Amino acid sequence: MKKAFLLVFAIACTHFLFAQPQQANQPATDPANAQAPYLRFPTLPPFHLLKLDSATFLTKDDVKKHRRTIIMFFSPDCDHCKRQTDSILADFDHFKDIEIVMATYQPFPEMKEFYAHYRLSEHPNIKMGRDEKFFLVPYYKIRNLPYLALYDKKGNLITTFEGTQKTSTILNAFEQKEHGE
């Protein structure tokens, strides 16, 4: 019994010795690799989203120029994403001049059902597409949904949010940017 315990203990110890993610002489973090791409390139990203018609694509060139923009990464079955959509639509008078790009990685039927349920076709400034190439998650290093990236009229990043935000928080971020310039 003692020998079995010692054997298991020795195996466990060697596991921890060899489980180090990097060599001892390497720096703990490489700033170029640690920084998310959206911080290195703080403008509208080159996304490529499959539109609801499942034949054409939504790209950054389809976003109206000289307008504030929100890129919202969401999941149709996420309760926080539903609440965020509800709050934006409830306060839509303040969002009607903001381009909203809603992107998801979830299956097409779920995305279409979400679009229909919230009657997003009634809002021409809201565009939706499926991130089939899974570009946005690593680009923003998304961990929580909904994820919101706010851009000014010039297409420059203002800030990002993870999780449900009050509409006043979103609108204040835009206002601070405009009044700070």
Residue ranges and their predicted role:
Residues 1-24, 177-181:
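Bacterial Sec-dependent N-terminal signal peptides
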Residues 15, 50-51, 151:
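Hydrophobic alpha-helical segments, especially N-terminal targeting/anchoring helices
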Residues 82-120, 135-138:
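Structural microenvironment flanking redox-active thiols in thiol-disulfide oxidoreductases
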Residues 118-149:
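Short, internal strand/loop/helix patches
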Residues 144, 150-181:
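Thiol-/selenol-based redox modules, centered on thioredoxin-like
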Residues 59-82, 88:
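Short active-site neighborhood of thiol/selenol oxidoreductases, capturing the structured segment around
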Residues 23-61:
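N-terminal "domain-start" segment that seeds a small globular fold
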